[in-house]
Amino acid sequence: MKDIKVIIAGPRGRMGHEAVLLMERTPHFQFVAAVDYKHGGEKISDLPGMPALDVPIYEDLHTCLDEIEADVLLDLTTPEVGKKHVTLAVEHGLRSVIGTTGFTEEELQHLTNIAKEKEVGTIIAPNFAIGAVLMMKFSQMAAKYFQDVEIIELHHDQKLDAPSGTAVKTVDLIRQHREPKQQGHPNETEQLKGVRGANVDGIHIHSVRLPGLIAHQEVLFGGDGQMLTVRHDSFNRASFMSGVKLSIETVMNLDHLVYGLENIMD
C-alpha cells in the first residue's frame, strides 16, 4: 500500500497519544506533523510519554498546512476546534478524518456540500470502535421489531459534550425504522426536572459522566414479556485504533463526506 502522510491534531490527548503509537507501528503511515496550540515549535519527542519521533509540532493548522505536505488530517481535538479544522482542511483540499463530535445537522450539511464541491474525502466518525458501530447497527435492526427503546450512554467525566455522538447517531439509525411515539404513561410527570433524560421522538437518552469510565453504551428495547439489551464497552483508547486505521486508509479513495464508520464498513 502506498504511504499515507498524516497530520495529527490533538496529539497530547489520550486518543491522540494512541494515534501517535498507531503511526509508529503502521509501516504505510507517515506521521509528518502535529498540531498543538501549547507546544508549537517543539517535536513530538519533546512531549512527556511520547515515542522518540522527530515530528514537528505546529501551533495552528493554518501554518502547518502552509509548510507541510500531507494526505490526511486526523483531528482528535475538541468539538469547537474540530469544526474549525475540518472546514479549513476541506477548503485546502486536504482529506480529513474527524474523531470529534457535536456537529449539528446544519453543520454536517454545510460540510457535506463543500466536500462535494471540492471533491475532498472526509470522514466524521462519532465512534471509531468497530464493536460500537456493530452495536449501532444491531440496534437499528432491532428497532424494526421493538418500538419502545431507551439509551444509556456512559463516559469519563472529562467528556465535553452530552449526549455522546454515538448516542445521537444511534437515535438517527433507530428513527429510520421507528415512527415517533410517546413512550411510557401518557400522563407521566417528572418530579425532578430532567430525570427522564433527553427525549427525541419518544426515545429517552440518559448520559452518565464518572471517573473510571471510558466509553460505554447500552440500548434497551422493551416488549411484552421480554427485553433486549444491546451493549458495547470500550475499556481503553486502543479499542478505537482499528477504526482510525480503517478511516485513514478509506478516506484516500473518497471524494465526498461520509458520516459514521458504519458507512465505510463492508
Curated annotation (Swiss-Prot):
InterPro entries: DapB_C, DapB_N, DapB_N_CS, DHDPR_bac, NAD(P)-bd_dom_sf. The keyword Amino-acid biosynthesis applies. GO terms for molecular function: 4-hydroxy-tetrahydrodipicolinate reductase; NAD binding; NADP binding; oxidoreductase activity, acting on CH or CH2 groups, NAD or NADP as acceptor. CDD domains: DHDPR_N (cd02274). Its main location: cytoplasm. It catalyses: (S)-2,3,4,5-tetrahydrodipicolinate + NAD(+) + H2O = (2S,4S)-4-hydroxy-2,3,4,5-tetrahydrodipicolinate + NADH + H(+); (S)-2,3,4,5-tetrahydrodipicolinate + NADP(+) + H2O = (2S,4S)-4-hydroxy-2,3,4,5-tetrahydrodipicolinate + NADPH + H(+). Pathway: Amino-acid biosynthesis; L-lysine biosynthesis via DAP pathway; (S)-tetrahydrodipicolinate from L-aspartate: step 4/4. PROSITE patterns: DAPB (PS01298). GO terms for cellular component: cytosol. It comes from the Bacteria. GO terms for biological process: diaminopimelate biosynthetic process; lysine biosynthetic process via diaminopimelate. It is an enzyme of class 1 (oxidoreductase). It is found in: Cytoplasm. NAD(+) binds at G10, P11, R12, G13, R14, M15, G99, T100, T101, A125, P126, N127, F128. The active site is at H155 (proton donor/acceptor), K159 (proton donor). NADP(+) binds at K38. Keywords: Amino-acid biosynthesis, Cytoplasm, Diaminopimelate biosynthesis, Lysine biosynthesis, NAD, NADP, Oxidoreductase. Transmembrane segments: none annotated. (S)-2,3,4,5-tetrahydrodipicolinate binds at H156, G165, T166. PANTHER family: 4-HYDROXY-TETRAHYDRODIPICOLINATE REDUCTASE 1, CHLOROPLASTIC-RELATED (PTHR20836:SF0), DIHYDRODIPICOLINATE REDUCTASE (PTHR20836). Catalyzes the conversion of 4-hydroxy-tetrahydrodipicolinate (HTPA) to tetrahydrodipicolinate. Belongs to the DapB family. This is 4-hydroxy-tetrahydrodipicolinate reductase. It comes from Bacillus cytotoxicus (strain DSM 22905 / CIP 110041 / 391-98 / NVH 391-98). The gene is dapB.
